[in-house]
Curated annotation (Swiss-Prot):
Annotated GO MF terms: double-stranded DNA binding
Species in which this protein is naturally found: Vibrio vulnificus (strain CMCP6)
Cytoplasm among keywords: yes
One Pfam family in the UniProt entry: RdgC
A GO biological process held by the record: DNA recombination
Listed GO CC annotations: bacterial nucleoid; cytoplasm
The organism's place on the tree of life at top rank: Bacteria
Name of the protein: Recombination-associated protein RdgC
HAMAP family assigned: RdgC (MF_00194)
Keywords: Cytoplasm, DNA recombination
Family recorded in the similarity comment: Belongs to the RdgC family.
Length: 304
Protein backbone atom coordinates (compact mmCIF):
# COMPACT_ATOMS: atom_id res chain seq x y z
CA UNK A 1 0.00 0.00 0.00
CA UNK A 2 2.93 2.36 0.59
CA UNK A 3 3.16 4.39 -2.62
CA UNK A 4 6.32 3.85 -4.68
CA UNK A 5 5.45 6.46 -7.31
CA UNK A 6 3.28 9.53 -7.16
CA UNK A 7 1.55 11.12 -10.14
CA UNK A 8 -0.11 14.16 -8.60
CA UNK A 9 -3.34 15.64 -9.96
CA UNK A 10 -5.21 18.60 -8.58
CA UNK A 11 -8.94 19.17 -8.54
CA UNK A 12 -9.63 22.28 -10.63
CA UNK A 13 -13.37 22.56 -9.98
CA UNK A 14 -15.43 22.02 -6.87
CA UNK A 15 -16.48 18.41 -6.46
CA UNK A 16 -17.59 16.44 -3.42
CA UNK A 17 -15.87 13.18 -2.59
CA UNK A 18 -18.38 11.29 -0.48
CA UNK A 19 -16.94 7.95 0.65
CA UNK A 20 -20.35 6.25 1.04
CA UNK A 21 -21.49 7.36 -2.40
CA UNK A 22 -18.16 6.44 -3.95
CA UNK A 23 -18.40 2.98 -2.38
CA UNK A 24 -21.65 2.34 -4.29
CA UNK A 25 -20.28 3.81 -7.52
CA UNK A 26 -17.14 1.66 -7.40
CA UNK A 27 -19.22 -1.47 -6.79
CA UNK A 28 -21.00 -0.84 -10.11
CA UNK A 29 -17.63 -1.00 -11.89
CA UNK A 30 -16.21 -3.87 -9.86
CA UNK A 31 -13.46 -5.92 -11.50
CA UNK A 32 -14.51 -9.26 -12.98
CA UNK A 33 -12.04 -11.78 -14.46
CA UNK A 34 -11.51 -12.10 -18.20
CA UNK A 35 -13.81 -14.47 -20.02
CA UNK A 36 -12.54 -16.77 -22.77
CA UNK A 37 -12.91 -14.06 -25.45
CA UNK A 38 -11.95 -10.99 -23.40
CA UNK A 39 -8.64 -9.30 -24.23
CA UNK A 40 -8.66 -7.35 -20.98
CA UNK A 41 -10.77 -6.39 -17.98
CA UNK A 42 -10.42 -3.26 -15.88
CA UNK A 43 -12.34 -2.52 -12.70
CA UNK A 44 -12.23 -1.79 -8.97
CA UNK A 45 -11.25 -4.17 -6.20
CA UNK A 46 -11.20 -3.83 -2.41
CA UNK A 47 -8.63 -1.24 -1.33
CA UNK A 48 -7.49 -3.61 1.44
CA UNK A 49 -7.35 -6.64 -0.84
CA UNK A 50 -8.16 -9.92 0.90
CA UNK A 51 -8.04 -8.15 4.28
CA UNK A 52 -11.22 -6.13 3.66
CA UNK A 53 -14.60 -6.18 1.94
CA UNK A 54 -15.08 -2.47 1.30
CA UNK A 55 -14.06 -0.98 -2.04
CA UNK A 56 -12.84 2.16 -0.27
CA UNK A 57 -10.56 2.61 2.72
CA UNK A 58 -11.06 5.86 4.61
CA UNK A 59 -9.05 7.69 7.24
CA UNK A 60 -10.55 11.03 8.28
CA UNK A 61 -11.57 12.44 4.86
CA UNK A 62 -8.83 10.66 2.88
CA UNK A 63 -9.98 7.90 0.56
CA UNK A 64 -7.94 5.03 -0.86
CA UNK A 65 -9.21 2.98 -3.81
CA UNK A 66 -7.62 0.32 -5.99
CA UNK A 67 -8.04 -0.59 -9.67
CA UNK A 68 -7.17 -3.97 -11.15
CA UNK A 69 -6.37 -4.59 -14.80
CA UNK A 70 -6.13 -8.06 -16.29
CA UNK A 71 -4.68 -8.45 -19.79
CA UNK A 72 -4.38 -11.54 -21.97
CA UNK A 73 -0.85 -12.10 -23.21
CA UNK A 74 -0.81 -12.62 -26.97
CA UNK A 75 2.75 -12.16 -28.26
CA UNK A 76 2.82 -10.34 -31.59
CA UNK A 77 5.36 -12.88 -32.88
CA UNK A 78 2.92 -15.77 -32.29
CA UNK A 79 0.09 -13.95 -34.07
CA UNK A 80 2.40 -13.01 -36.96
CA UNK A 81 3.68 -16.56 -37.37
CA UNK A 82 0.15 -18.00 -37.44
CA UNK A 83 -1.03 -15.29 -39.82
CA UNK A 84 1.85 -15.80 -42.26
CA UNK A 85 1.18 -19.54 -42.35
CA UNK A 86 -2.54 -19.07 -43.03
CA UNK A 87 -1.98 -16.36 -45.64
CA UNK A 88 0.57 -18.54 -47.44
CA UNK A 89 -1.79 -21.53 -47.44
CA UNK A 90 -4.80 -19.53 -48.70
CA UNK A 91 -2.81 -17.74 -51.40
CA UNK A 92 -1.50 -21.08 -52.65
CA UNK A 93 -5.02 -22.53 -52.59
CA UNK A 94 -6.64 -19.59 -54.41
CA UNK A 95 -3.73 -18.74 -56.66
CA UNK A 96 -3.82 -15.03 -55.84
CA UNK A 97 -2.48 -12.63 -53.21
CA UNK A 98 -4.91 -11.89 -50.36
CA UNK A 99 -6.25 -8.37 -49.97
CA UNK A 100 -5.50 -6.27 -46.90
CA UNK A 101 -9.04 -6.68 -45.53
CA UNK A 102 -8.84 -10.45 -45.92
CA UNK A 103 -5.59 -10.52 -43.94
CA UNK A 104 -7.17 -8.40 -41.20
CA UNK A 105 -10.10 -10.81 -40.99
CA UNK A 106 -7.70 -13.74 -40.71
CA UNK A 107 -5.79 -11.96 -37.97
CA UNK A 108 -8.98 -11.42 -35.96
CA UNK A 109 -9.87 -15.10 -36.34
CA UNK A 110 -6.42 -16.09 -35.08
CA UNK A 111 -6.76 -13.81 -32.04
CA UNK A 112 -10.22 -15.24 -31.25
CA UNK A 113 -8.76 -18.75 -31.50
CA UNK A 114 -5.76 -17.96 -29.27
CA UNK A 115 -7.52 -15.91 -26.55
CA UNK A 116 -9.00 -18.84 -24.55
CA UNK A 117 -5.51 -20.38 -24.25
CA UNK A 118 -3.60 -17.17 -23.55
CA UNK A 119 -1.96 -16.46 -20.20
CA UNK A 120 -3.13 -13.44 -18.23
CA UNK A 121 -1.18 -10.82 -16.33
CA UNK A 122 -2.70 -8.54 -13.72
CA UNK A 123 -1.64 -5.36 -11.98
CA UNK A 124 -3.11 -3.20 -9.24
CA UNK A 125 -3.01 0.60 -9.11
CA UNK A 126 -3.79 2.56 -5.96
CA UNK A 127 -5.44 5.98 -6.05
CA UNK A 128 -5.41 8.27 -3.02
CA UNK A 129 -7.94 11.10 -2.79
CA UNK A 130 -6.95 14.00 -0.51
CA UNK A 131 -10.02 16.30 -0.55
CA UNK A 132 -8.66 18.85 1.95
CA UNK A 133 -5.48 19.38 -0.09
CA UNK A 134 -7.36 19.17 -3.41
CA UNK A 135 -5.07 16.42 -4.71
CA UNK A 136 -5.58 13.01 -6.27
CA UNK A 137 -2.47 10.82 -6.22
CA UNK A 138 -1.92 7.79 -8.45
CA UNK A 139 0.74 5.20 -7.66
CA UNK A 140 1.72 4.70 -11.31
CA UNK A 141 5.04 4.78 -13.14
CA UNK A 142 3.81 7.14 -15.87
CA UNK A 143 1.13 9.73 -16.55
CA UNK A 144 -0.25 7.44 -19.27
CA UNK A 145 -0.94 4.66 -16.76
CA UNK A 146 -2.32 7.19 -14.28
CA UNK A 147 -4.65 8.64 -16.93
CA UNK A 148 -6.01 5.16 -17.70
CA UNK A 149 -7.02 4.69 -14.06
CA UNK A 150 -8.42 8.22 -13.78
CA UNK A 151 -10.47 7.62 -16.93
CA UNK A 152 -12.04 4.64 -15.16
CA UNK A 153 -12.66 6.76 -12.06
CA UNK A 154 -14.20 9.51 -14.20
CA UNK A 155 -16.52 6.96 -15.80
CA UNK A 156 -17.35 5.59 -12.34
CA UNK A 157 -18.14 8.99 -10.80
CA UNK A 158 -19.62 10.64 -13.88
CA UNK A 159 -17.28 13.62 -13.54
CA UNK A 160 -13.70 14.13 -12.37
CA UNK A 161 -12.32 17.64 -13.00
CA UNK A 162 -8.58 17.10 -12.46
CA UNK A 163 -5.36 18.18 -14.17
CA UNK A 164 -1.72 17.22 -13.56
CA UNK A 165 -0.19 19.31 -10.79
CA UNK A 166 2.49 21.13 -12.79
CA UNK A 167 4.20 24.18 -11.22
CA UNK A 168 4.04 27.53 -13.01
CA UNK A 169 7.82 27.73 -13.23
CA UNK A 170 9.52 25.06 -15.37
CA UNK A 171 10.62 22.27 -13.03
CA UNK A 172 13.92 21.73 -14.85
CA UNK A 173 14.80 25.40 -14.31
CA UNK A 174 14.33 25.02 -10.55
CA UNK A 175 16.19 21.70 -10.35
CA UNK A 176 19.10 23.11 -12.36
CA UNK A 177 19.31 26.10 -10.03
CA UNK A 178 19.39 23.85 -6.96
CA UNK A 179 22.27 21.80 -8.37
CA UNK A 180 24.12 24.83 -9.74
CA UNK A 181 24.09 26.68 -6.43
CA UNK A 182 24.11 23.65 -4.14
CA UNK A 183 21.29 25.34 -2.25
CA UNK A 184 17.84 23.85 -1.77
CA UNK A 185 14.76 25.14 0.07
CA UNK A 186 14.51 24.35 3.76
CA UNK A 187 13.77 20.69 4.41
CA UNK A 188 15.09 19.47 1.04
CA UNK A 189 18.55 18.00 0.43
CA UNK A 190 20.34 16.87 -2.72
CA UNK A 191 21.19 13.18 -2.91
CA UNK A 192 23.69 11.65 -5.34
CA UNK A 193 21.71 10.98 -8.50
CA UNK A 194 20.59 13.14 -11.42
CA UNK A 195 19.90 13.26 -15.14
CA UNK A 196 20.99 16.21 -17.28
CA UNK A 197 19.86 16.89 -20.85
CA UNK A 198 21.18 19.28 -23.43
CA UNK A 199 18.83 22.09 -24.41
CA UNK A 200 19.76 21.34 -28.05
CA UNK A 201 17.40 19.02 -29.89
CA UNK A 202 20.14 16.51 -30.79
CA UNK A 203 22.19 17.11 -27.65
CA UNK A 204 23.35 14.51 -25.19
CA UNK A 205 21.99 13.07 -21.95
CA UNK A 206 24.07 12.52 -18.82
CA UNK A 207 22.88 10.11 -16.14
CA UNK A 208 24.86 9.95 -12.94
CA UNK A 209 24.60 7.88 -9.77
CA UNK A 210 26.65 8.00 -6.58
CA UNK A 211 27.97 11.35 -7.77
CA UNK A 212 28.63 14.55 -5.84
CA UNK A 213 26.16 16.76 -7.70
CA UNK A 214 27.86 20.05 -6.81
CA UNK A 215 31.20 18.85 -8.23
CA UNK A 216 33.01 20.74 -10.99
CA UNK A 217 32.25 17.88 -13.39
CA UNK A 218 28.48 18.31 -13.02
CA UNK A 219 28.71 22.11 -13.03
CA UNK A 220 30.65 21.96 -16.31
CA UNK A 221 27.74 20.12 -17.92
CA UNK A 222 25.34 22.82 -16.71
CA UNK A 223 27.71 25.48 -18.06
CA UNK A 224 27.58 23.64 -21.40
CA UNK A 225 23.82 24.25 -21.65
CA UNK A 226 22.50 21.11 -20.01
CA UNK A 227 19.55 21.26 -17.62
CA UNK A 228 18.66 18.92 -14.77
CA UNK A 229 15.65 16.82 -15.78
CA UNK A 230 15.69 14.30 -12.91
CA UNK A 231 16.98 14.81 -9.40
CA UNK A 232 17.14 12.56 -6.33
CA UNK A 233 16.12 14.42 -3.19
CA UNK A 234 15.53 13.89 0.51
CA UNK A 235 12.76 15.64 2.42
CA UNK A 236 13.23 16.19 6.15
CA UNK A 237 15.00 12.83 6.53
CA UNK A 238 11.55 11.26 6.14
CA UNK A 239 11.20 10.77 2.39
CA UNK A 240 13.53 10.04 -0.50
CA UNK A 241 12.38 10.40 -4.10
CA UNK A 242 13.36 11.22 -7.67
CA UNK A 243 11.66 14.30 -9.10
CA UNK A 244 11.41 14.63 -12.89
CA UNK A 245 10.89 17.67 -15.09
CA UNK A 246 7.25 16.65 -15.69
CA UNK A 247 6.69 16.91 -11.90
CA UNK A 248 6.32 13.14 -11.57
CA UNK A 249 7.65 11.60 -8.36
CA UNK A 250 9.33 8.21 -8.72
CA UNK A 251 11.08 5.76 -6.39
CA UNK A 252 9.31 7.21 -3.40
CA UNK A 253 10.77 5.76 -0.22
CA UNK A 254 9.43 6.43 3.27
CA UNK A 255 12.01 6.35 6.06
CA UNK A 256 12.43 3.18 8.12
CA UNK A 257 11.86 5.27 11.22
CA UNK A 258 8.43 6.26 9.94
CA UNK A 259 7.45 2.78 8.79
CA UNK A 260 8.57 1.23 12.08
CA UNK A 261 6.15 3.39 14.07
CA UNK A 262 3.44 0.75 13.76
CA UNK A 263 5.62 -2.23 14.70
CA UNK A 264 3.70 -2.57 17.97
CA UNK A 265 0.68 -3.78 15.97
CA UNK A 266 0.80 -7.60 15.63
CA UNK A 267 1.64 -8.71 12.09
CA UNK A 268 -1.26 -11.14 12.27
CA UNK A 269 -3.71 -8.24 12.52
CA UNK A 270 -3.31 -7.25 8.87
CA UNK A 271 -6.36 -5.00 8.78
CA UNK A 272 -5.23 -2.92 11.77
CA UNK A 273 -1.69 -2.65 10.38
CA UNK A 274 -3.00 -1.59 6.96
CA UNK A 275 -5.16 1.11 8.53
CA UNK A 276 -2.33 2.42 10.72
CA UNK A 277 0.16 2.45 7.83
CA UNK A 278 -2.38 4.21 5.63
CA UNK A 279 -2.84 6.96 8.22
CA UNK A 280 0.93 7.42 8.48
CA UNK A 281 1.38 7.60 4.71
CA UNK A 282 -1.47 10.09 4.32
CA UNK A 283 -0.03 12.29 7.03
CA UNK A 284 3.38 12.38 5.36
CA UNK A 285 2.08 13.03 1.84
CA UNK A 286 -0.34 15.71 3.07
CA UNK A 287 2.61 17.60 4.57
CA UNK A 288 5.15 16.81 1.85
CA UNK A 289 3.27 17.73 -1.33
CA UNK A 290 2.26 21.32 -0.44
CA UNK A 291 5.84 21.85 0.78
CA UNK A 292 7.26 20.47 -2.49
CA UNK A 293 5.08 22.56 -4.77
CA UNK A 294 5.83 25.66 -2.73
CA UNK A 295 9.56 24.93 -3.13
CA UNK A 296 9.03 24.59 -6.89
CA UNK A 297 7.50 28.06 -7.13
CA UNK A 298 3.84 27.24 -6.61
CA UNK A 299 1.02 25.86 -8.73
CA UNK A 300 -1.04 28.00 -11.10
CA UNK A 301 -4.54 29.07 -10.06
CA UNK A 302 -6.88 26.04 -10.27
CA UNK A 303 -8.98 27.60 -13.03
CA UNK A 304 -6.05 29.06 -14.99
Amino acid sequence: MWFKNCMVYRVNREIEFNADQLEKQLAEFRYTPCGSQDKQKFGWVSAMGRHGDMMTHVSEDRILICAKKEEKMLPASVIKESLNAKVEAMEAQEGRPLKKKEKETLKEEIIIDLLPRAFSRSNHTYVLILPKEGFILVDASSYKKAEDVLALLRKTMGSLPVVPAIPEKAVETTLTEWVKTGQTPQGFHLLDEAELKSVLEDGGIIRCKKQELTSDEILSHIAADKVVTKLALNWQERLEFVLADDASIKRLKFSDELRDQNDDIPREDQAARFDADFSLMCGELSAFLPNLFQALGGLPHPNA
